[in-house]
Amino acid sequence: MTNKIVTKAMIMSAGVGSRLEPLTYAVPKPLIPIANKPVMDILLEKLRELGIKNVICNTYYLAEKIIERYQYNQLGIHFNYIKEDTLSGTAGGLKKCQNFFDKGETFIVLSADGLTNADIEKGIASHIKSGAIATIGIKQIPHEEVSHFGVVVTDENGFIKEFQEKPTVEDAKSNYINTGIYIFNYEIFDFIPENTFYDFAKNVFPELLKKRKINTFEINEYWTDIGTLAQYKQSTKDLFFGLCRFKHTPIINSASGKYINNGSEIPACTVFEGTSTIGSGCKIGKNVKIIDSIIWDDVILEDNITVKNSIIASKSHIASDICDEVIGSNEIIQKIKAWFLGYFLLDLEETAQVCKSYLVKIKLYRGTMAQR
């Protein structure tokens, strides 16, 4: 079923993604893969299912990579974009897209790091019925986690009466949070000045509160913010366990615990434990063990190594055991032999990480000495 009311949407895509470093050194946050597919692909497919074909993004960090991927996409989306010279805030970015929307229309705004299969159609219906200027998708979470999010307090009719920005557990008046899924009327632009850094939570919503014009709809389906490394890892596990469902991936409730894209070379002797994904074009050596890890495209893993609880970005070359590591794109991790004052360090598990900045990081785990 597709809606017939909302025909346009915006995806906020300008963020640098510093909490996902080093993955975002070479890849913008919207292109971070979930089960080997960029999160923005998933969002665009979700919008297409709703009947929304016209989408605009505000870009800033690594903008050309986003534009290159979607300007001539095969997703059935008419992709539009603006390039920001400086960051404008969440609301300021929307303001720069104002000419894309028609006066009087209702539209959707999503965050590029929000992974969800929310019933947005339910949100649209709630928005229209409410007469609000803005409707926010809210999610109930465990009370002990509220300090990481913007908390919303609603009245008996679902209208917001108070916001709390990352309150302490003791001070939180609710355990419902703002998911960054918005449905707006065109009138929202009246509350955002031109050429000003402006934020929804800090600047726009307080003004709408005075007019009692912010409605909510509850998201009972899956939603997560993949803006941190920990949550990025968890979202992949959630796919395996069937907690979130997206049409593009076959790994839901996978008994094998692994998802491998076509075109990767995986020997039969490879051992998988836990849940792992492997991108396309990867070359895995003999007797490799992969445990609870996310491996992007075109990665090389040498023989006789173990990769555990790690993320390896595209085109990296791994020749040493790694555990609890996050490796950015185009990096080399290898075992090396070291000499010191005429002594050879034996049984030394050293890792040399040679990254694009040409720095070398040495990790000494254990070693003994023998004369040269």
Question: Which role fits each region the language model picked out?
Answer:
Residues 22-25:
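Conserved catalytic-core motifs of eukaryotic protein kinase domains, centered on the activation segment
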Residues 31, 151-154, 205, 216:
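A structural signal for short hydrophobic beta-strand segments in well-ordered beta-sheet cores
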Residues 56-60, 137-138, 311:
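Short internal beta-strands
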Residues 89-91, 149-165:
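Acidic/His-rich active-site region of diverse nucleotide-sugar glycosyltransferases
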Residues 106-108, 115, 121-128, 141-144, ...:
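Catalytic-core segments of class I nucleotidyltransferases/pyrophosphorylases
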Residues 249-253, 258, 263-271, 276, ...:
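A structural motif detector for beta-strand N-caps
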